[in-house]
A protein has these predicted regions:
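An N-terminal assembly and electron-transfer interface module characteristic of large anaerobic redox
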Residues: 1-337
Length: 337
């Protein structure tokens, strides 16, 4: 359904460089959740950053079945400073992407590929650290990659999250220079999983600082110009009117019970309760309008709503931990795209 969409609709370039360094970014992703947040991040940089401007082009992987989009990708790749890809698990399209990107990989300043098929992951390039080298290494990361490379996207992403949490122990097995680049890769993954426009803005500025800018351009961009990732729960409970995400069902139900915008009937412990299963990326990137509409409609019909989310594709954990303790009358998978 994406093949008739022209990828040029996602192209953003600064109106005026004002003497700033122009950095060209190309990204290829599975679904459209990141489009809005990335676009907002780039527009914020172009409007307000004193030393850096971004030109960005984006593609959904299915769009590469269209020959016009594929040729456009190859043209964009040829002049890119930064390449980003995520969740590329469709085999024929993964091979097509590698064929377009691999000839230009050495010319990138940096390439960051998040959970994808092994041949796509090998396109990663961050300083002296390259995932393509891990097959010849005896490091902890190498063993992790070998065990995970045949697994599904959900298992791979869950494994990457575990690796992220044990990063200090992993880095001690690498030489200092490679350890720093490995840290930057995992830091990039934190920014990406955070998904908000703020996180993605800081992600792009971090890559610019560490890998793109040289000499005077680098001196203009101090590390203070970007912030550490804002980390959101891997799984939990969300509501469009709540002040934050919840990691405990009791905290969520306590908040629900003191809401002033709903009737007493909804606060009744015996009120019907509908559990929703949501995908985390839609929430952190702000691509949540369909979730908001579902919650509002169910509440208007007299049902209490308990929307749980998870970061991977395995929703059994949040269902077991949150929904089964919430006196649920019905469960609905709300992953509608």
């Amino acid at each position: 359904m994406f093949t008739q969409v022209k990828s040029t609709i996602r192209h953003i370039a600064p109106d005026d460089l004002r003497g700033r360094k122009l950095i060209k970014v190309v990204y290829v992703v599975l679904e459209s959740q990141y489009q809005s947040a990335l676009s907002q991040a780039v527009r914020e940089i172009n409007a307000n950053h004193p030393s850096v401007a971004i030109e960005i082009s984006g593609y959904l992987i299915e769009e590469l079945r269209n020959s016009e989009n594929y040729e456009e990708l190859k043209r964009d790749i040829a002049s890119a400073n930064i390449f980003i890809a995520s969740l590329i698990f469709i085999e024929d399209l993964a091979q097509k992407l590698v064929a377009a990107v691999e000839p230009h990989r050495d010319n990138f300043d940096v390439a960051v590929v998040f959970p994808s098929m092994p041949e796509v992951m090998r396109l990663n390039k961050m300083g002296s650290f390259s995932l393509a080298q891990l097959g010849q290494s005896k490091s902890v990361i190498a063993n992790f990659m070998k065990k995970r490379k045949e697994k599904s996207g959900a298992g791979f992403q869950d494994g990457m999250l575990k690796l992220l949490r044990t990063l200090p122990q992993v880095l001690k097995f690498l030489p200092i220079e490679k350890a720093q680049d490995a840290r930057n890769f995992m830091l990039s993954f934190q920014y990406w999983l955070g998904g908000s426009a703020e996180n993605l803005e800081n992600f792009l500025l971090m890559l610019a600082d560490k890998y793109v800018l040289k000499g005077e351009d680098k001196q203009k961009l101090a590390a203070a110009d970007y912030q550490a990732p804002v980390v959101y729960p891997d799984m939990g409970i969300w509501h469009p009117l709540a002040p934050n995400m919840f990691e405990d069902v009791r905290e969520y139900l306590n908040w629900y019970a003191v809401r002033r915008d709903i009737s007493r009937n909804l606060k009744d412990p015996l009120a019907p309760c509908v559990g929703l299963v949501l995908q985390r990326t839609h929430l952190v990137t702000g691509d949540d309008a369909h979730y908001v509409a579902i919650v509002q409609e169910l509440e208007s019909l007299g049902a209490k709503v308990l929307p749980v989310f998870a970061g991977g594709l395995d929703f059994s954990k949040p269902v077991d931990m949150q929904l089964l303790g919430g006196k649920i009358s019905a469960v609905r998978n709300a992953h509608l795209t």
